[in-house]
Amino acid sequence: MYQSRRRRRRRWGRRILSRYKRKWGRRSRRGHGIYRRWRRWRRRPRTVVTEQHSRRVKTIIVRGWEPLGNICPTDSARAKATPYASYDSDSGQGQWHGTWGHHWFTFQSLVDRAEARLNSFSGNWESYDYLRFLGGTMYFMQPREMCFMFGNDPYLMTSDLDKTASQKNRAEETWITPGYLMHRPGTHLILSRQKVERRSMYKIRVPVPTSWRGWFPIPDCFSYVLCHWYWTWWDPDACFFDPCATGSSCEAEPWWSTAQTKQAWVDRTKLDDPPVGGTGPNQKTWAPFLPSRPCTNYYTHSASFWFKYKLKFQVTGENIWAPVPRDYSQRGTVPTAPSRQQVESEARAPYPKTNRPPTTADILPGDLDSDGILEDEAYERITRDNPCPKRPRPLGIRWWDGTPGRTLQEQQQAAVLRPKPRRQLLRRLRDVLLQL
């Protein structure tokens, strides 16, 4: 009698597997049970392709430093520093000292600062079509004695402020005062070493503005604002009195505490300049956390404020044109830094002078006498009808007969060396005119 083979006992969870018994085949219920995956076999809906990006992407990092200005003992509370005017335009002259300021970065301003060697690009955007901004970082060094505030406003506007016809965005200048920026979000208080000792630099992130989301054509986005910053000097020790005022200014009531002048201190551009002889305790020359000027009794040194930045960009696109590789065999891998004489010569002569071959109508060496008057032969050569000289032919082989052509020196000698003319009549005419 045929005896069936004994069924092998399962050595794993028999009772557990009985709950999830496969009823419709082995592959129909895969992914269910104790080893179930979340939506493993669910089909995703098909989407329509709306845009296609190029795979040719390049990252460009811009590293540099930006001057904010110098703090001098003679600067008033309303003095504005504009060192950026020296780089944004060729004819601009910026003021490098003041107690506050603000400006912005555009891609064009970064290129202008690269020409002045204030920053450097990690790569070039030649043969690319589109660009996008990925944010960056600003680094600040701790001052020795003075303190200042710094803020970044990434939501100012899209285009460059200097190129807009309206002046509505200039209203932000009226709010850059320490008493108002103290309670505004995004304002960083950078204290001196006398207040707080730090080993590393202050690091401030530069977010991507809302208007910079996505890719933009490179020629169109040169004037878009990347980030807008503002800064101001402030004194945490002399907050509610003017230390530069004469008399007992600490005991006097501030001029901006009355009912009529509660908001008059906000616009620092409307403050008065302190007189030379000294200010009184109730003069409108100072504001909360902002004395009339950096008093020499508190500060023994002037200060320079600046920051270091690192901005990140990406370029993409398939351009039909490609740049020519640089030939390193002529100038080497690292060129020589420009000297002062080279920079001045380039500024004085922007267009190079072209040297043309001399002709018989030119005043040649030896044509003038001791009194600076033309000789007879030179005068006759210049005033007579001279045919237009032919274009000098370079040294080489003519393609039609294979004979070597004349050099440039031979053609010039043939055009200049001609037989000396006779000028007896002109000499007599000159003698008659001299006698008259």
From Swiss-Prot:
Keyword Zinc-finger applies: no
Q: Where is this region: Disordered?
A: 326-370
This protein's GO cellular component annotations are: T=1 icosahedral viral capsid
Q: Where in the cell is it found?
A: Virion
Which segments show compositional bias classed as Polar residues? 330-344
Q: Does the keyword Acetylation apply?
A: no
Q: Which family does it belong to?
A: Belongs to the anelloviridae capsid protein family.
Q: What is its main location?
A: virion
Q: What is this protein called?
A: Capsid protein
Q: Which domain of life is it from?
A: Viruses
InterPro entries recorded for this chain?
A: TTvirus_Unk (IPR004219)
* Signal sequence segment: none
Protein's job: Self-assembles to form an icosahedral capsid with a T=1 symmetry, about 30 nm in diameter, and consisting of 60 capsid proteins. The capsid encapsulates the genomic DNA. Capsid protein is involved in attachment and entry into the host cell.
Note the Pfam families from the entry: TT_ORF1
UniProt entry keywords in alphabetical sequence: Capsid protein, T=1 icosahedral capsid protein, Virion
